[in-house]
Amino acid sequence: LNLAAESGEFIAVLGPNGVGKSTLLGTILGTRKLTAGSVDVNCRVGFIPQQRMFPADLPLRARDLVSLSLAHGAFRRRRPPRHRVDELLAEVGATGLRDRRVGQLSGGQQQLIRQAQALANDPELILADEPLLSLDPARQQDTVEKLDALRRERGTSIIFVTHGINPVLGVTDKVLYLAPGGHTFGAVDEVMRSDVLSELYGSKVNVLNVDGRLIVV
Protein backbone atom coordinates (compact mmCIF):
# COMPACT_ATOMS: atom_id res chain seq x y z
CA LEU A 1 0.00 0.00 0.00
CA ASN A 2 1.36 3.40 -1.04
CA LEU A 3 -0.59 6.29 0.44
CA ALA A 4 0.23 9.99 0.52
CA ALA A 5 -2.06 12.64 2.00
CA GLU A 6 -1.58 15.98 0.31
CA SER A 7 -2.23 19.28 2.07
CA GLY A 8 -5.97 19.92 2.35
CA GLU A 9 -6.90 16.51 0.96
CA PHE A 10 -9.86 14.50 2.29
CA ILE A 11 -9.32 10.74 2.03
CA ALA A 12 -12.13 8.34 2.95
CA VAL A 13 -11.04 4.85 4.04
CA LEU A 14 -13.72 2.23 3.39
CA GLY A 15 -14.10 -1.52 3.68
CA PRO A 16 -15.72 -4.31 5.71
CA ASN A 17 -14.83 -5.19 9.29
CA GLY A 18 -11.47 -6.81 9.90
CA VAL A 19 -9.55 -5.59 6.84
CA GLY A 20 -7.25 -3.21 8.73
CA LYS A 21 -8.80 0.26 8.58
CA SER A 22 -8.09 1.03 12.24
CA THR A 23 -4.74 -0.76 11.99
CA LEU A 24 -3.78 1.60 9.18
CA LEU A 25 -4.44 4.62 11.40
CA GLY A 26 -2.50 3.00 14.24
CA THR A 27 0.44 2.49 11.90
CA ILE A 28 0.41 6.16 10.91
CA LEU A 29 0.18 7.16 14.59
CA GLY A 30 3.07 4.87 15.49
CA THR A 31 1.06 2.67 17.87
CA ARG A 32 1.31 -0.33 15.50
CA LYS A 33 4.62 -1.70 14.27
CA LEU A 34 5.33 -2.25 10.61
CA THR A 35 6.61 -5.60 9.37
CA ALA A 36 7.91 -3.96 6.19
CA GLY A 37 8.06 -0.56 4.54
CA SER A 38 8.00 2.83 6.25
CA VAL A 39 5.69 5.62 7.37
CA ASP A 40 6.81 9.25 7.24
CA VAL A 41 4.78 11.81 9.18
CA ASN A 42 6.31 15.28 9.25
CA CYS A 43 3.49 17.29 10.76
CA ARG A 44 1.28 17.73 13.82
CA VAL A 45 -1.36 15.00 14.05
CA GLY A 46 -4.79 15.04 15.67
CA PHE A 47 -6.60 11.77 16.34
CA ILE A 48 -10.31 11.08 16.81
CA PRO A 49 -10.44 7.50 18.13
CA GLN A 50 -13.13 4.92 17.57
CA GLN A 51 -16.03 5.28 20.00
CA ARG A 52 -15.41 3.86 23.47
CA MET A 53 -17.43 4.99 26.45
CA PHE A 54 -15.59 6.70 29.30
CA PRO A 55 -16.11 5.01 32.71
CA ALA A 56 -19.31 6.30 34.32
CA ASP A 57 -17.44 7.25 37.51
CA LEU A 58 -14.59 9.13 35.80
CA PRO A 59 -14.20 12.29 37.93
CA LEU A 60 -13.21 14.58 35.05
CA ARG A 61 -15.21 17.28 33.33
CA ALA A 62 -15.22 17.80 29.59
CA ARG A 63 -13.13 20.92 30.10
CA ASP A 64 -10.55 18.89 32.06
CA LEU A 65 -10.03 16.38 29.26
CA VAL A 66 -9.54 19.07 26.64
CA SER A 67 -7.18 20.90 28.98
CA LEU A 68 -5.08 17.72 29.32
CA SER A 69 -4.78 17.52 25.53
CA LEU A 70 -3.56 21.11 25.42
CA ALA A 71 -1.13 20.42 28.26
CA HIS A 72 0.64 17.88 26.04
CA GLY A 73 0.97 20.37 23.21
CA ALA A 74 2.06 24.00 23.02
CA PHE A 75 1.15 24.65 26.68
CA ARG A 76 2.86 21.57 28.15
CA ARG A 77 5.03 23.65 30.51
CA ARG A 78 2.22 25.73 31.91
CA ARG A 79 -1.48 25.53 32.52
CA PRO A 80 -3.45 25.97 29.29
CA PRO A 81 -5.44 29.21 29.15
CA ARG A 82 -9.08 28.62 30.01
CA HIS A 83 -10.28 30.63 27.03
CA ARG A 84 -8.44 28.26 24.65
CA VAL A 85 -10.20 25.25 26.18
CA ASP A 86 -13.54 27.00 25.79
CA GLU A 87 -12.72 27.90 22.16
CA LEU A 88 -12.08 24.26 21.28
CA LEU A 89 -15.31 23.12 22.90
CA ALA A 90 -17.21 25.86 21.08
CA GLU A 91 -15.62 24.84 17.78
CA VAL A 92 -17.23 21.38 18.00
CA GLY A 93 -20.54 22.62 19.42
CA ALA A 94 -19.91 21.36 22.96
CA THR A 95 -19.91 24.60 24.98
CA GLY A 96 -22.84 23.41 27.07
CA LEU A 97 -20.93 20.27 28.09
CA ARG A 98 -17.78 21.91 29.43
CA ASP A 99 -18.59 21.56 33.14
CA ARG A 100 -20.27 18.15 32.95
CA ARG A 101 -18.52 14.94 33.98
CA VAL A 102 -17.58 13.03 30.87
CA GLY A 103 -18.70 9.69 32.27
CA GLN A 104 -22.24 11.01 32.50
CA LEU A 105 -22.37 12.13 28.86
CA SER A 106 -24.01 10.17 26.05
CA GLY A 107 -21.89 8.42 23.44
CA GLY A 108 -22.49 11.21 20.93
CA GLN A 109 -21.60 13.90 23.46
CA GLN A 110 -18.40 12.07 24.39
CA GLN A 111 -17.50 11.91 20.71
CA LEU A 112 -17.73 15.72 20.51
CA ILE A 113 -15.22 15.98 23.38
CA ARG A 114 -12.85 13.67 21.48
CA GLN A 115 -13.16 15.95 18.47
CA ALA A 116 -12.16 18.94 20.61
CA GLN A 117 -9.16 16.99 21.92
CA ALA A 118 -8.07 16.18 18.37
CA LEU A 119 -7.98 19.89 17.50
CA ALA A 120 -5.94 20.87 20.56
CA ASN A 121 -2.53 20.95 18.86
CA ASP A 122 -3.74 22.74 15.71
CA PRO A 123 -3.12 19.60 13.62
CA GLU A 124 -1.96 19.55 10.03
CA LEU A 125 -3.26 15.99 9.67
CA ILE A 126 -6.39 14.57 11.32
CA LEU A 127 -6.89 10.82 11.59
CA ALA A 128 -10.54 10.04 12.26
CA ASP A 129 -11.58 6.48 13.14
CA GLU A 130 -15.33 6.27 12.49
CA PRO A 131 -16.03 9.64 14.17
CA LEU A 132 -19.70 9.65 13.14
CA LEU A 133 -20.65 6.69 15.33
CA SER A 134 -23.21 7.58 18.04
CA LEU A 135 -23.94 10.93 16.39
CA ASP A 136 -27.41 11.81 15.14
CA PRO A 137 -27.72 12.83 11.45
CA ALA A 138 -27.53 16.56 12.23
CA ARG A 139 -24.34 16.11 14.28
CA GLN A 140 -22.89 13.87 11.58
CA GLN A 141 -23.40 16.58 8.98
CA ASP A 142 -22.00 19.21 11.34
CA THR A 143 -18.88 17.12 11.99
CA VAL A 144 -18.23 16.57 8.29
CA GLU A 145 -18.75 20.27 7.55
CA LYS A 146 -16.28 21.27 10.29
CA LEU A 147 -13.60 18.91 9.00
CA ASP A 148 -14.22 20.12 5.46
CA ALA A 149 -13.82 23.74 6.62
CA LEU A 150 -10.54 22.86 8.37
CA ARG A 151 -9.00 21.41 5.26
CA ARG A 152 -10.21 24.26 3.04
CA GLU A 153 -9.27 27.11 5.39
CA ARG A 154 -6.12 25.72 7.03
CA GLY A 155 -4.94 23.08 4.58
CA THR A 156 -5.46 20.29 7.12
CA SER A 157 -5.30 16.81 5.60
CA ILE A 158 -8.04 14.38 6.66
CA ILE A 159 -7.87 10.57 6.67
CA PHE A 160 -11.38 9.48 7.57
CA VAL A 161 -12.31 5.86 8.32
CA THR A 162 -15.99 5.12 7.74
CA HIS A 163 -18.28 2.22 6.86
CA GLY A 164 -20.30 4.33 4.43
CA ILE A 165 -19.25 6.86 1.80
CA ASN A 166 -22.51 8.83 1.70
CA PRO A 167 -22.03 11.12 4.75
CA VAL A 168 -18.70 12.32 3.28
CA LEU A 169 -19.43 11.87 -0.42
CA GLY A 170 -19.62 15.60 -1.12
CA VAL A 171 -16.24 16.40 0.48
CA THR A 172 -14.14 13.34 -0.39
CA ASP A 173 -11.23 13.81 -2.78
CA LYS A 174 -10.01 10.20 -2.82
CA VAL A 175 -11.12 6.80 -1.55
CA LEU A 176 -8.92 4.05 -0.15
CA TYR A 177 -11.01 0.87 -0.28
CA LEU A 178 -9.64 -2.06 1.71
CA ALA A 179 -10.99 -5.55 1.08
CA PRO A 180 -9.94 -9.10 2.02
CA GLY A 181 -8.46 -9.55 -1.45
CA GLY A 182 -6.49 -6.32 -1.67
CA HIS A 183 -7.05 -2.59 -1.94
CA THR A 184 -7.57 0.21 -4.41
CA PHE A 185 -6.97 3.95 -4.14
CA GLY A 186 -8.22 6.79 -6.31
CA ALA A 187 -10.94 9.32 -6.95
CA VAL A 188 -14.50 8.42 -5.89
CA ASP A 189 -15.68 7.72 -9.44
CA GLU A 190 -12.62 5.54 -10.06
CA VAL A 191 -13.04 3.36 -6.96
CA MET A 192 -16.77 3.20 -6.23
CA ARG A 193 -17.60 1.14 -9.30
CA SER A 194 -19.13 -2.30 -9.65
CA ASP A 195 -16.25 -3.71 -11.73
CA VAL A 196 -13.52 -2.39 -9.40
CA LEU A 197 -15.12 -3.66 -6.18
CA SER A 198 -16.10 -6.98 -7.79
CA GLU A 199 -12.46 -7.57 -8.66
CA LEU A 200 -11.40 -6.66 -5.11
CA TYR A 201 -13.87 -9.03 -3.47
CA GLY A 202 -13.52 -11.79 -6.04
CA SER A 203 -17.30 -11.94 -6.41
CA LYS A 204 -20.09 -9.87 -7.90
CA VAL A 205 -20.55 -6.48 -6.22
CA ASN A 206 -23.01 -3.86 -7.43
CA VAL A 207 -22.58 -0.15 -6.77
CA LEU A 208 -25.89 1.64 -7.21
CA ASN A 209 -26.48 5.39 -7.42
CA VAL A 210 -29.87 6.13 -5.88
CA ASP A 211 -30.79 9.82 -5.77
CA GLY A 212 -27.14 10.82 -5.41
CA ARG A 213 -26.37 8.21 -2.74
CA LEU A 214 -24.05 5.27 -3.40
CA ILE A 215 -25.21 1.85 -2.24
CA VAL A 216 -22.86 -1.16 -2.30
CA VAL A 217 -24.71 -4.46 -2.68
What residue ranges belong to the model's regions?
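ABC ATPase nucleotide-binding domains
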Residues: 194, 200-217
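H-loop/switch region of ABC-family ATPase nucleotide-binding domains
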Residues: 162-163
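Helix-to-loop junction immediately C-terminal to a conserved catalytic motif
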Residues: 29
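Conserved catalytic motifs of ABC-family nucleotide-binding domains
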Residues: 122
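Catalytic Walker B motif of ABC-type/P-loop ATPase nucleotide-binding domains
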Residues: 126-130
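Conserved ABC ATPase signature
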Residues: 101-105
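Conserved ABC ATPase "signature" region
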Residues: 80-97
